[in-house]
Amino acid sequence: MKITIRNIDEPIEFSEEYVSTLEVRNKYLFREIINCLVRSQFEKHEYEIVNFDDGAALSDRLIIVSDVMSFDVGSRKIISEMYKQLMDMIDNDVLKNMVKMETILERIGAFAEDSLNFDINYRTDFDLNDFLKLLKIEPSIASEYDIKQRVYGIIELINSLFDNKIICFMNLKQLITKEEFSEIVKTCLSKKQLVWFIESNKSFVNTSESIIVVDDDLYAYKQNR
């Protein structure tokens, strides 16, 4: 699996054997790449800046983490996948109870209709997704100001819900130590989780890291591990 980026000769390759890092020291190109990736999570169209080599949509494969502490674990993409998996796992006994709940809700609607002196509308059709929304089920990860634990929580969440998703962390190295990064890399490799670190400055290097550096003059090269 590869990503190509306009103005960068070297493609970004992804593997379960190493983590991938793009170090862009040209601030204008860095900003252009980041804007494209963030926008891709909300808009679906062909991008001129960043593309998968097989034409796959960025939003279908990338989970963008621009800010570890404010990452939205309740995003539509995450919640919809979680609901889908829950609905596949729920057994018949639960479904029978759901029918009882649906009957109760219908009776409440009928009572409201009989009790008011004007016409009303109320729902009579419910599905499991509706009841999950009522429960407001959503993931929970460490909320305290511990960046490393938040990163672990995000990796665990995405790895549990999705197959073949790439987690894209932006400027994470600037917030953690070399030792913390090493532990994060080990976690990703052990879980076979594809990750992509995008950095705007020169930083430390890990032996399990494949790094593409783009200097200020837009010259791209692979950095030795």
Question: Which residues does each PLM region occupy?
Answer:
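Short acidic, S/G/P-rich loop/turn micro-motifs used as interaction or catalytic elements
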Residues: K27-L29, S140-Y145, N171-T177, S203
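Long, charge-rich alpha-helical interaction segments
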Residues: D93-K100, I104-I108
